[in-house]
């Protein structure tokens, strides 16, 4: 399966992201990843965690990270988060879920517009890359997320980190939870609220199926109704 977590804070959030992602480690066994938005762009790190715990893999990486917004992911398959440069601007993205019609979506994208996909080991296509390609067909990030939600057969929960804030979108069937937490000067979205108490956040609410929220350090705003 997997888990995701993201932060929008007035203060440096690297340690919250580090521990918050680690607290999701029981949801996946293969890969972990973190991405921080810094003044000079995105700083991303991904490691295989099959044979070593998350913390030992990333404790050196976080020394080179500094920023107030970031996302993390634990995965049983796809390496993520990914960084994307598109007509909607640059962003980082992480997902959780299952896409049952992946081949159909790939063929549709290749037919309708210039597209290319990086092949992973084993010949598959990264689910998160595919979702990003769908988002890029939209007028903006919210419209792109709606397109992805409509096209995917199965379920996909999405975090998109932009320079303006964090988009958090729950899958359309509500199969994978996405929960909003809050502390003074910061908001976060996570697959599990278990992490909140350990990093000083309090439960605020759970997104409804297909709901899209936009988080900044000052607010949690619904920008796509459930």
Give the ranges of each region predicted by the language model.
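Conserved short alpha-helical segments that host acidic/polar catalytic motifs at enzyme active sites
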Residues: 1-226
